[in-house]
Amino acid sequence: MLLGVNIDHIAVLREARQVNDPDILMGMYAAIIGGADQITTHLREDRRHINENDVKDIINHSRVPVNLECSINEEIIDFVCKFRPHRATLVPEKREELTTEGGLNLSTAGLENIINRLKNEGIKVSLFIDTSRENIDIASELAVDCIELHTGTYANIFNMLNSNIALTKYSIKNYEKSREDLQNLLKDELANIKHLAAYAKGLGLKVAAGHGLNYQNVASLTKNSEIFELNIGQSIIARAIFVGMKTAVCEMKELIK
């Protein structure tokens, strides 16, 4: 299974003090040395962390494929077409959200035209989608190269079941349930992800997954799964604070191999 390392949170740390440190390219190089198969980054409309110069540098200097997450905003798509990353993953975006909260609405007007424009530029296209067969069917009809299944629900249930988050201010209200209920929900969500990955592969789609994945919850996703790639960011950057980026990526690679 391949690992895409999302390096956005290096820029989050930089922007916290609005200085030029840490260097996004140094982080990228360390991730690649650690075994990253792909560099993933998200150019948001509000440029809250990664900016255009970062993306240009990443595309120009990465020796592994670059997966650029982006909204379908016209200005952003113009930029993507100009600098041509290996892949563009189309995601929904809200200014007020801390991170991407759900999958892309595949009935959005103009989506097919944007996909075709990107493909005409030689850019592979992926759609970040919620876990439903209907979304996969639509993605197949749109003739994209890849889908990325939103694993946020799985990650949230896992976290509430297997950590102390329920006892903190970060408790996830929707999953304040009994341990037995959480175990059943987790089993069902994991089975659903694996079933949908197999279904999508049967339609000729490559299947990636991501959102909320960490060193504790990835192992279950890798067993008997048709998912070919995981995109993971915050947990790797957080681990890197203590062990360094190279080691943090190596450890994740070991877990998903």
UniProtKB/Swiss-Prot annotation:
EC number assigned by the record: 2.6.99.2
Function in brief: Catalyzes the complicated ring closure reaction between the two acyclic compounds 1-deoxy-D-xylulose-5-phosphate (DXP) and 3-amino-2-oxopropyl phosphate (1-amino-acetone-3-phosphate or AAP) to form pyridoxine 5'-phosphate (PNP) and inorganic phosphate.
Catalytic residue list: H42, E69, H211
Transmembrane segments: none
Species annotation: Campylobacter hominis (strain ATCC BAA-381 / DSM 21671 / CCUG 45161 / LMG 19568 / NCTC 13146 / CH001A)
Record's keyword terms, sorted: Cytoplasm, Pyridoxine biosynthesis, Transferase
Primary location group: cytoplasm
GO molecular function: pyridoxine 5'-phosphate synthase activity
Reactions it catalyzes: 3-amino-2-oxopropyl phosphate + 1-deoxy-D-xylulose 5-phosphate = pyridoxine 5'-phosphate + phosphate + 2 H2O + H(+)
Binding site for 3-amino-2-oxopropyl phosphate: N6, R17, G212, G233, Q234
Subunit structure of this chain's protein: Homooctamer; tetramer of dimers.
PANTHER family hit by this protein: PYRIDOXINE 5'-PHOSPHATE SYNTHASE
Record site feature (Transition state stabilizer), residues: E148
Subcellular location: Cytoplasm
Protein's name in the database: Pyridoxine 5'-phosphate synthase
Family listed: Belongs to the PNP synthase family.
Cellular compartments per GO CC: cytosol
GO biological process, one term: pyridoxine biosynthetic process
Record Gene3D superfamilies: Aldolase class I (3.20.20.70)
Pathway(s) it belongs to: Cofactor biosynthesis; pyridoxine 5'-phosphate biosynthesis; pyridoxine 5'-phosphate from D-erythrose 4-phosphate: step 5/5
Top class in the EC scheme: transferase
InterPro entries found in the cross-reference section: Aldolase_TIM, PyrdxlP_synth_PdxJ, Pyridoxine-5'_phos_synth
Record-listed 1-deoxy-D-xylulose 5-phosphate binding positions: D8, H9, R44, H49, T99
Keyword Phosphoprotein tagged: no
